[in-house]
Amino acid sequence: MADKTSFLDKCLSIHSLLLQHGIDSGIIFKQNESECFITVNGKSKRYTSDDDIDIDTEFSALEKF
């Protein structure tokens, strides 16, 4: 399993980038913070602490929601 702090930081970084670019989004953490859901325009993407998350790639994908 990936480092939990790193996972949380990555989820929060993606969410922060969306907000900085004026994209209304939400974030929810579940399962003892081993899952996060980022919502943009009513669509959610689920991430788990086992995922290899690239912040720039995920931001670009969510930006298109």
Whereabouts are the PLM-identified features?
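Surface-exposed charge patches in extracellular/virion surface proteins
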Residues: 10, 45-46, 64
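Short acidic DE-rich linear segments
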Residues: 2-6, 60-65
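Acidic, low-complexity, intrinsically disordered interaction modules
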Residues: 16-58
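Negatively charged, low-complexity tracts enriched in Asp/Glu with abundant Ser/Thr
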Residues: 2-22
